[in-house]
Amino acid sequence: MSRVAKAPVAIPAGVEVTLNEQTITVKGTKGSLTRVINSDVSVVVEDNEIKCSPVESAKTAAQAGTARALINNMVVGVTEGFVKKLTLVGVGYRAKLAGKDIDLTLGFSHPLVHKLPDGVTAECPSQTEIVLSGTDKQLIGQVAAEIRGYRPPEPYKGKGVRYADEQVRRKEAKKK
């Protein structure tokens, strides 16, 4: 069995977990999340713990570990939430909020407008910082990757949109 799946997920106080066949719903102070679990995994809720185990063979053990990690992310999301920080590096690179949109000026001839999906909130503490937050870890990461994808950091000058904790490997320019 997967080492990850062996550890049960603890349900903190104030979190309600409902299991309906292969659909699990987690409700907490920050909202609720629903996910369909793979049919190769059996999920049991008992004694303020969620336990995942593979249904058949060793081939499905990886699915049990994945399901356990996804459920843990749901529990953490509805209690604490997730935050992803982006930094804009470059002359004239700016970000500002306009309702549910982020207006990005990234050196193109036109400004880019990125629409935020439901469940993701954004803040701009400064013109060169974007802070994304929400309950769904996958959705936060997806939105952050889309914004970074507009202008990924380039290795020569380091300009572009990067994650706050990202280290960009720099290259030396060609010499004559």
Swiss-Prot record:
Molecular function terms from GO: rRNA binding; structural constituent of ribosome
Compositionally skewed regions (Basic and acidic residues) per UniProt: 151-170
A Pfam family the protein falls into: Ribosomal_L6
Example GO biological process: cytoplasmic translation
Stretch list, region Disordered: 151-176
Record key words, sorted: Ribonucleoprotein, Ribosomal protein, RNA-binding, rRNA-binding
Family matches, as Gene3D superfamilies: Ribosomal protein L6, alpha-beta domain (3.90.930.12)
Annotated GO CC locations: cytosolic large ribosomal subunit
Function of the protein: This protein binds to the 23S rRNA, and is important in its secondary structure. It is located near the subunit interface in the base of the L7/L12 stalk, and near the tRNA binding site of the peptidyltransferase center.
Record family assignment: Belongs to the universal ribosomal protein uL6 family.
NCBIfam families (alphabetical): L6_bact (TIGR03654)
Subunit and partners: Part of the 50S ribosomal subunit.
Name listed for the protein in its UniProt record: Large ribosomal subunit protein uL6
Organism name: Shewanella halifaxensis (strain HAW-EB4)
